[in-house]
A protein has these predicted regions:
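C-terminal domain-boundary segment and adjacent tail
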Residues: 4-15, 71-158
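Active-site-adjacent pocket scaffolds in enzyme catalytic domains
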Residues: 1-81, 135-146
Length: 158
């Protein structure tokens, strides 16, 4: 049967929970434009905010838009990496929108993030497998953390 659902409309950057026995891996609200607001962690949301949904926006703005996308993904990653350590979920349509800048942004983020100490870049299946073997009380404690909250880990993970 189904073990996870990655189609949720979005939520804050917190540890996943199960809904009706299925892991919910939603898109996440990430800092956008240096934290002016939060935007969903999906290429279409950047496209909508940057070029009003036009898939072939102004090419002169591609470098800026790509950097904004990288910065948003990295801000979300860093918030959790130095905080709650919640997983980062990124949605992508594998399209060539705005000159392929969203795919290029993900390539940059992967090269930066997946090499960091203590980070594992995994599939949803691998994450579900790992989540399934964690102690329920540990997951509950993790879910209670603010994304940027770096706890006393000895009190959370026992």
């Amino acid at each position: 049967g189904w073990r996870y659902d990655a189609s949720s409309p979005g939520d804050f950057q917190i540890w996943p929970t199960k809904k009706n026995g299925i892991w919910d891996f939603p898109l996440e609200m990430l800092p956008y434009e240096n934290g002016k607001y939060q935007g969903l962690s999906m290429d279409f949301n950047f496209l909508y905010n940057q070029s009003d949904g036009e898939t072939k926006g102004d090419p002169a703005k591609y470098p800026l838009w790509q950097q904004q996308t990288v910065d948003s993904y990295m801000a979300g990653f860093n918030r959790a990496y130095y905080g709650s350590r919640a997983p980062l979920f990124i949605g992508n349509h594998f399209e060539d929108w705005n000159g392929g800048i969203y795919m290029k942004a993900i390539d940059q983020v992967i090269k930066n993030v997946c090499t960091k100490k203590g980070v594992k870049c995994v599939s949803f299946k691998e994450l579900a497998d790992w989540m399934d073997v964690q102690k329920p009380e540990t997951l509950q404690a993790l879910r209670g953390l603010d994304p940027a909250q770096s706890p006393d880990w000895s009190s959370v993970v026992k």
